[in-house]
């Protein structure tokens, strides 16, 4: 059985694709850390209600990348989703 270069490379490509898909299906995804949701362990570590340390945590800015004609990194914070380009120029978030 002789394989031409095209057949051999296509078989290798299919095998690599199958390996990648199977490993992606097996690995667990930590959605809590990915989306900024507190896990059960973090919730138990919070102080008791009425404690001196029971204050709301500081707001952290959410950084995200938008791909269009150019890849740009934005920082979003606030209730209304004000968005600022990371290198200083403001860019209002349009919905």
From Swiss-Prot:
One of its GO terms (biological process) is neuropeptide signaling pathway. Disulfide bonds: none annotated. Its main location: secreted. Keywords: Amidation, Cleavage on pair of basic residues, Neuropeptide, Repeat, Secreted, Signal. One of its GO terms (cellular component) is extracellular region. It is found in: Secreted. The modification Phenylalanine amide is found at residues 67, 77, 87. Residues 25-58, 90-95 form a propeptide. Residues 1-24 form the signal peptide. FMRFamides and FMRFamide-like peptides are neuropeptides. AQTFVRF-amide inhibits the activity of dissected pharyngeal myogenic muscle system. Belongs to the FARP (FMRFamide related peptide) family. This is FMRFamide-like neuropeptides 16. It comes from Caenorhabditis briggsae. The gene is flp-16.
């Amino acid at each position: 059985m002789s394989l031409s270069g095209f057949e051999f490379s296509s078989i290798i490509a299919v095998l690599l694709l199958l390996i990648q898909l199977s490993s992606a299906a097996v690995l667990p995804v930590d959605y809590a850390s990915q989306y900024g949701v507190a896990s059960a362990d973090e919730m138990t570590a919070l102080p008791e209600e009425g404690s001196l340390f029971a204050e709301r945590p500081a707001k952290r800015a959410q950084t995200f990348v938008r791909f269009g004609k150019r890849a740009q990194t934005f920082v979003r914070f606030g209730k209304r989703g004000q968005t600022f380009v990371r290198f200083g120029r403001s860019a209002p978030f349009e919905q």
